[in-house]
């Protein structure tokens, strides 16, 4: 009988619960994970239940374990997710799970970095590169030869066309689109429903059709 690997989900919020559901969907087809519970640095959540799983403590608990520990960071904010992962770099026992919903359509010519999460209904085509700790939420598409940087968050129903380059820690809002071959600089935020028709070369928040930068 296959031995299940213990898994902790960092982030006991709404997306964390969605990832717990994703884990259950994986296990229904191929038993892989023993979901031990959630990790969250909000002490008010400790010793509570989320989606039937305990919030066992903060991130410092992970470092107290001597055995290899699989975790995945289910925090939507790209920058907060990066801060959490950077905080855990000193813990040699931590291994990052990569979770892909069974409904995802993905070619065998896709490179996926550790700690990434790909949610139900997504399609990733050929010769795509996904960095580490990327979140691709429900019903997204990623076209041929696209490169998605580390810690990128794609919210539901994002469409990224072929040969697009998305920099580290970019957030792509719900329902937005990027036309073929465009580049988005690291740390940019594209608002929900926006359409990127030219390169985004400066950090900032962009909204509209086509998107333009929000000036403070």
Region spans (language model):
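Short alpha-helical
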Residues: 14-17, 79-80, 195
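A generic structural signal for alpha->beta connector loops
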Residues: 32-35, 52, 68, 93, ...
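Active-site catalytic pocket residues across diverse enzymes, especially alpha/beta-hydrolases
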Residues: 23-27, 88
């Amino acid at each position: 009988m296959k031995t299940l690997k213990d898994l902790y989900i960092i982030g006991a919020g709404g997306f964390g619960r969605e990832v717990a559901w994703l884990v259950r969907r994986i296990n229904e087809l191929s038993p892989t994970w023993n979901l031990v519970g959630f990790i969250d640095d909000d002490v008010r959540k400790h010793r509570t239940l989320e989606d039937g799983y305990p919030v066992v403590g903060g991130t410092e608990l992970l470092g107290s374990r001597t055995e290899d520990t699989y975790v995945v960071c289910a925090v939507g904010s790209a920058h907060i997710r990066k801060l959490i992962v950077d905080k855990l770099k000193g813990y040699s026992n931590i291994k990052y799970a990569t979770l892909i919903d069974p409904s995802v359509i993905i070619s065998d010519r896709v490179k996926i970095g550790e700690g990434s999460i790909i949610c139900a209904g997504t399609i990733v085509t050929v010769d795509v590169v996904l960095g580490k700790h990327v979140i691709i939420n429900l019903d997204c598409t990623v076209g041929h030869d696209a490169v998605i940087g580390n810690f990128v968050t794609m919210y539901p129903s994002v469409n990224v066309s072929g040969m697009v380059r998305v920099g580290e820690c970019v957030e792509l809002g719900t329902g937005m689109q990027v036309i073929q071959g465009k580049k988005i600089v690291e740390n940019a935020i594209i608002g929900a429903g926006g359409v990127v028709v030219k390169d985004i070369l400066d950090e900032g928040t962009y909204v509209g059709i086509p998107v333009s930068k929000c000036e403070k």
